[in-house]
Curated annotation (Swiss-Prot):
GO terms for cellular component: ribonucleoprotein complex; ribosome. The keyword Ribosomal protein applies. This is Small ribosomal subunit protein uS11. InterPro entries: Ribosomal_uS11 (IPR001971), Ribosomal_uS11_bac-type (IPR019981), Ribosomal_uS11_CS (IPR018102), Ribosomal_uS11_sf (IPR036967). Belongs to the universal ribosomal protein uS11 family. Part of the 30S ribosomal subunit. Interacts with proteins S7 and S18. Binds to IF-3. It comes from Polynucleobacter asymbioticus (strain DSM 18221 / CIP 109841 / QLW-P1DMWA-1) (Polynucleobacter necessarius subsp. asymbioticus).
Amino acid sequence: MAKQQSASAASQRARKKVKKNVADGIAHVHASFNNTIITITDRQGNALSWATSGGQGFKGSRKSTPFAAQVAAEVAGKAAVECGIKNLEVQIKGPGPGRESAVRALNSLGIKITEIQDVTPVPHNGCRPPKRRRI
């Protein structure tokens, strides 16, 4: 009896990933000073693929390099191409060093970039910023 329950529980966990077929989507590039996160979604905002610099094996200060952002964008872009992505609208957020290289990596995969937006949040004099670093 216990074996039947465990077999059904295992089949629920090992569900096959459903491949979506979407022609155009949005690439969200979040480039902070410490890491770069690339998420590719459809027009409704449902995630198709994502990758981070840290997830590609870069640790510490190497996560925040343009090359790490390029590798992460290539991984996310290849997974999106498998879902049928042809056109991408790119939304860049943050001041990090991986902004430009992530967009170039997506472009080099053969995906047509239709629009590039900078959606970095800018405060209208909101919270007090942290004090300056003195080195």
